[in-house]
A protein has these predicted regions:
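A short, basic N-terminal segment
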Residues: 1-51, 268, 272
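C-terminal alpha-helical "lid" subdomain
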Residues: 2-11, 70, 187, 204-275
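Mid-core helix/loop region of P-loop NTP-binding domains shared across ATPases and GTPases
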Residues: 11-13, 92-95, 107-151, 159-164, ...
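Conserved NTP-binding/hydrolysis module of P-loop NTPases
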Residues: 18-23, 81-83, 91-110
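Walker A/P-loop nucleotide-binding motif
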Residues: 51-71
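Short hydrophobic/aromatic beta-strand immediately N-terminal to the Walker A/P-loop
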Residues: 55-58, 85, 137
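Short regulatory helix/loop adjacent to the ATP-binding pocket of P-loop NTPases
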Residues: 73-76, 176-191
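Conserved AAA+ ATPase "SRH/arginine-finger" region at the nucleotide-binding site
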Residues: 86-89, 180, 193-206
Length: 275
């Protein structure tokens, strides 16, 4: 199956005159569509960073959380902000600290207390010597163990100083909220000042999304009939990753039929290949 994918991709791209893969999930920053959701997330994150607090971003798998994070963080001036991005796992607090130490380009040193001191020292140096603000972004935060949430607030506490040194952005699935509601998570949860949730997009937004992705490939007209857009929206439930697969598959089906327009039947055919 893998061997057949590239010729199939080249065939539909050639048929529709596309300059690149359609509905590519790995878009460059300049090609990301700034939706109302993303604008709202940006505003909430700006507020979180100003306060040096904790912000949340939740959403189901494929809803576009990581893309939204990349876009929002790209708007932070690189000479002013040092962004530390960690993709969380279900490991211990020590493993989390090791990930953080690695991103800070520090040596993997000692026990937990030594690591905490080293992390805080590194953050202080960035803030005081480089005159930069540090923001910690934890993607897939819903994978984190409860005992890690119970201790995570310690790296935001700097003795004899109320200055907000380390704002944190936590991104994950909706069960992230459940984990933060545990009593042991309260020291961290009490620092949350902003919360965003990536909702599935509606039918109108889906049409804008499809047109945007077609334009990225160099196609200036809407190849999708109205009922095809509705079929993509209904079939994906408004989840962007599913919509990408469906829409691309429908383009392949249309090209195979030598049809310059994508119909609902092409979308349904694509759905049988994907789901």
């Amino acid at each position: 199956m893998e061997k057949g994918r590239e010729p199939m991709s080249a065939t539909y791209r050639s048929f529709f005159g596309m300059t690149r893969e359609a509905f590519d999930p790995d878009l460059g920053l300049k090609d990301i569509l700034e939706t109302q959701d993303i604008t709202s997330i940006r505003q909430r994150f700006d507020y979180t960073l100003r306060l040096g607090a904790v912000g949340l971003l939740t959403g189901e798998v494929g809803s576009g959380k990581s893309t939204a994070l990349r876009f929002v963080l790209s708007k932070l001036h690189p000479s002013e902000y040092k962004t530390i991005w960690i993709t969380a796992c279900s490991g211990s607090i020590l493993e989390f600290y090791r990930l953080l130490i690695s991103e800070l380009n520090m040596g993997n040193t000692g026990c937990k207390s030594v690591m905490i001191k080293s992390i805080k020292k590194s953050i202080r140096q960035i803030v005081l010597e480089k005159k930069m603000k540090v923001v910690l972004v934890v993607d897939e935060a819903s994978l984190i163990r409860l005992e890690v949430f119970a201790e995570l607030h310690t790296i935001t506490q700097f003795e004899q100083d109320s200055k907000p040194w380390l704002p944190i952005i936590l991104a994950g699935r909706s069960n992230l909220i459940d984990k933060l509601m545990y009593q042991t998570s309260m020291p961290l949860a009490s620092r949350i000042v902003a919360r965003s949730h990536m909702e599935p997009i509606n039918r109108q937004e889906m049409e804008q999304y499809i047109l945007h992705h077609l334009a990225i490939t160099g196609v200036k007209t809407n190849l999708f009939e109205d009922n095809a857009i509705t079929a993509v929206h209904q079939g994906s439930g408004g989840i962007l990753r599913k919509a990408n697969h469906l829409a691309r598959g429908a383009l392949v089906a249309a090209a195979k039929d030598q049809s310059m327009t994508v119909t609902a039947d092409h979308v349904r055919l694509a759905s049988t290949e994907i789901f």
